[in-house]
Amino acid sequence: MTGELWLTLVDTADIVGFSMTFCVNIVLLFLLKNRGKNLGTYKHLMAFFSVFSIFYAIIESILRPIMHIENATFFLISRKRFNYSTRLGKINSAFYCACFATSFVVSGVHFVYRFFASCKPHLLRSFNMPYLLLWPLGCSIPVMMWASVSYFLYPDTAFTEAAVTNVLNTHYHSIKKDNVSYIAYVYYQYDENGVRYVYLKNLLGCFVHYFVMSATFVVMFICGYLTWKTMRKHKTASDRTRQLQKQLFKALVLQTLIPTIFMYAPTGVMFIAPFFSINLNANANFIVFCSFLYPGLDPLILILIIRDFRQTVFKFFCLRKKNSVDESRSTTRANMSQVATH
């Protein structure tokens, strides 16, 4: 598809994703406050993820990122809503990368908690105060690694300036160079003889990114598998326990699939395609498309799977529907009475 068509799709996903993320996470925060008493410390982790998801959606809507892969180079381009300096634009792009990395890391922490709760309950004390404060500190390390690499190892050069200008002029005619900031992941360059060589500085940064992403995925997969394995061992439990285990299993499967489909797989393509000189061009924007939708999907799964949350939401809408029907019937009866008196 053309770059202009992808811009339309990405901007639509931005509106839909932001609206869904804001509404679903506000509902989840309300449910956590009023129906989350039995979740223990996990509700604080869920609340943090909900607040972060809303914040992340706001950052995405402000920076309006697009992605492009061409000539063994991956471009992360942010469309400016305001006029600011090139350096501030670079900082903003690195900050977006930090938020992007945080979504990976926090998802991994979710699975660690679920693993502790199912397999190592004695370790759950690590999610209580004061140990709870160590988790944000630990999570900040890979996040800062990702952001620092994005800022320091991918400088703007004459080559990247010419390359991003060519990309905009060729694929995104409605975007002017002065209205964007960018980070260019250059995998290969050419010497004065036209011989291609690996650009080690940028490749090192890509390795750091890929390591952080792979580490969180491995944690998520191992914790998910061990949790699933533990659940299967409790088949002889009571009907009520089996029902609860079934709910948790569904949540576990969906919470594994959603990040894999909307985060890990697209980001894996983002790093691998340039290495093999696969020119996705504007089609790389499917990564942005997925990232806009993900923050609203994960909490929606929790609302639909956790019975107390689901029943509360359904009762709310059913009650509103019932009240609407009753009001309509009352209005109809009143009108009929007026007609009868005349």
UniProtKB/Swiss-Prot annotation:
GO terms for cellular component: ciliary membrane; dendrite; neuronal cell body; non-motile cilium; periciliary membrane compartment; plasma membrane. It is found in: Cell projection, Cilium membrane. The keyword Transferase does not apply. It is a multi-pass membrane protein. The keyword Transmembrane applies. SUPFAM superfamilies: Family A G protein-coupled receptor-like. Keywords: Cell membrane, Cell projection, Chemotaxis, Cilium, Glycoprotein, Membrane, Olfaction, Receptor, Sensory transduction, Transmembrane, Transmembrane helix. Residues 1-11, 60-92, 153-202, 279-285 are extracellular. The chain crosses the membrane at residues 12-32, 39-59, 93-113, 132-152, 203-223, 258-278, 286-306. GO terms for molecular function: G protein-coupled olfactory receptor activity; G-protein alpha-subunit binding. Glycans are attached at residues 71, 83, 179. One of its GO terms (biological process) is positive chemotaxis. Residues 33-38, 114-131, 224-257, 307-342 are cytoplasmic. Coiled coil: none annotated. Its main location: membrane. InterPro entries: 7TM_GPCR_serpentine_rcpt_Str. Belongs to the nematode receptor-like protein str family. An odorant receptor which affects chemotaxis to the volatile odorant diacetyl. Specifies AWA neuronal cell fate via the odr-7 pathway. Interacts with odr-4. This is Serpentine receptor class r-10. It comes from Caenorhabditis briggsae.
